[in-house]
């Protein structure tokens, strides 16, 4: 029973914690400040372990100057990819993913057809801009759409960890797979609760 209380809770972090302004602003005004504030709090949360897949870490580095990241970052956050050769995923995951992708492709096709119908009514640049926006909404919102997303899902499953992300597609699929997640807007409060 005592081991239960000593066991560290594992947390898998998405870049949205530090990059997405709606979430990041709970920690800092820019990604570097958000990382600094996160590190200050995370250092004191002794009962939590933090992980980030290597693909997500590389994505994060596109947005921050690595020289400005506190050295403690590399001590507190473990960069770990999921074991892609041993990960097991329920068949229903693939079944539902394929079905959803097919529906989205059909929706994307309808968006493209409507753009073609509007050719005489708008100039080409406006049509392309509108097409890109609607096509992106039809195909990408609410779905796992990158290898980074897959790594976050599989690492969370492998570690039996809590996923922290602002990506609605990841939240949706984490929920389907029984992965615990925390509303990112409440993540700082969660960290502070882990301290006290």
UniProtKB/Swiss-Prot annotation:
CDD domains reported for this sequence: PIN_VapC-like
Gene Ontology molecular functions: ribonuclease P activity
Organism of provenance: Thermodesulfovibrio yellowstonii (strain ATCC 51303 / DSM 11347 / YP87)
Family as reported in the entry's similarity comment: Belongs to the HARP family.
NCBIfam families recorded: PRK04358.1-5 (NF003344), RNA_lig_partner (TIGR03875)
Entry keyword Repeat: no
Transmembrane residue ranges: none
rRNA processing listed as a keyword: no
EC code(s) of this entry: 3.1.26.5
Gene Ontology terms: biological process: tRNA 5'-leader removal
Function: RNA-free RNase P that catalyzes the removal of the 5'-leader sequence from pre-tRNA to produce the mature 5'-terminus.
UniProt feature coiled coil, ranges: none
Record field: catalytic activity: Endonucleolytic cleavage of RNA, removing 5'-extranucleotides from tRNA precursor
Top EC class of this enzyme: hydrolase
SUPFAM superfamilies noted in UniProt: PIN domain-like
InterPro entries membership: PIN-like_dom_sf, RNA_free_RNase_P
Keyword vocabulary terms for this entry: Endonuclease, Hydrolase, Nuclease, tRNA processing
Superkingdom: Bacteria
Stated name of the protein: RNA-free ribonuclease P
């Amino acid at each position: 029973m005592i081991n239960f209380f000593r066991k560290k809770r594992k947390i898998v972090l998405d870049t949205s914690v530090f990059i997405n302004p709606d979430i990041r602003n709970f920690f800092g005004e820019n990604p570097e400040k958000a990382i600094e504030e996160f590190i200050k709090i995370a250092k004191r949360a002794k009962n939590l372990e933090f992980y980030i897949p290597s693909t997500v870490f590389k994505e994060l580095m596109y947005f921050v100057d690595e020289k400005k990241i506190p050295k403690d970052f590399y001590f507190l956050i473990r960069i770990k990819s999921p074991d892609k050769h041993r990960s097991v995923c329920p068949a229903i995951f693939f079944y539902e993913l394929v079905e959803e992708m097919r529906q989205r492709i059909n929706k994307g096709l309808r968006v493209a057809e409507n753009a073609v119908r509007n050719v005489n009514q708008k100039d080409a640049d406006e049509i392309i801009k509108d097409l890109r926006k609607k096509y992106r909404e039809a195909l990408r919102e609410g779905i796992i759409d990158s290898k980074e997303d897959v790594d976050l899902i599989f690492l969370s499953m492998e570690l039996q960890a809590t996923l922290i992300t602002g990506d609605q597609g990841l939240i949706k699929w984490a929920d389907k797979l029984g992965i615990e997640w925390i509303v990112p807007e409440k993540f700082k409060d969660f960290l502070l609760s882990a301290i006290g």
